[in-house]
């Protein structure tokens, strides 16, 4: 009876450890995804800030190209 109890406790401990490890991995993936979204948003803001001063020139160039 003692061996069965020990095996059951060992099995439950391994399952618990596995579930906790999976949870940590999932949280890590979510954190990396959030960081990736933040980096992407920051890059878009930086791109727009650099593009704005040149926007009127780009529009004029396109308009001149259309006029021929």
Curated annotation (Swiss-Prot):
**Residues with the Lysine amide modification:** 67
Similarity comment: Belongs to the frog skin active peptide (FSAP) family. Brevinin subfamily.
- Tissue specificity as recorded in UniProt: Expressed by the skin dorsal glands.
What name has this protein been given in UniProt?
Kasstasin
Q: Name one GO cellular component term.
A: extracellular region
Q: What is the lineage of its organism?
A: Eukaryota, Metazoa, Chordata, Craniata, Vertebrata
**Can you cite a GO biological process for this protein?**
defense response to bacterium
Q: Where in the cell is it found?
A: Secreted
Instruction: State any further remark.
Output: Kasstasin is a derivation of Kassina, the taxon of origin, and the Ancient Greek word 'stasis' meaning 'stoppage of flow'.
Instruction: State its role.
Output: Peptide with potent vasoconstrictor properties (EC50=25 pM). Has moderate antimicrobial activity against Gram-positive bacterium S.aureus (MIC=55 uM) and against Gram-negative bacterium E.coli (MIC=110 uM). Not active against fungus C.albicans. Has weak hemolytic activity against horse erythrocytes.
Q: Say which species the protein is native to.
A: Phlyctimantis maculatus (Red-legged running frog)
Q: Where is the signal peptide?
A: 1-20
Q: Where is this region: Disordered?
A: 22-41
Keywords for this protein? Amidation, Amphibian defense peptide, Antibiotic, Antimicrobial, Cleavage on pair of basic residues, Cytolysis, Hemolysis, Secreted, Signal, Vasoactive, Vasoconstrictor
Q: Which InterPro entries match?
A: Frog_antimicrobial_propeptide
Pfam families hit by this protein: FSAP_sig_propep (PF03032)
Question: Which residues are part of the propeptide segment?
Answer: 21-44
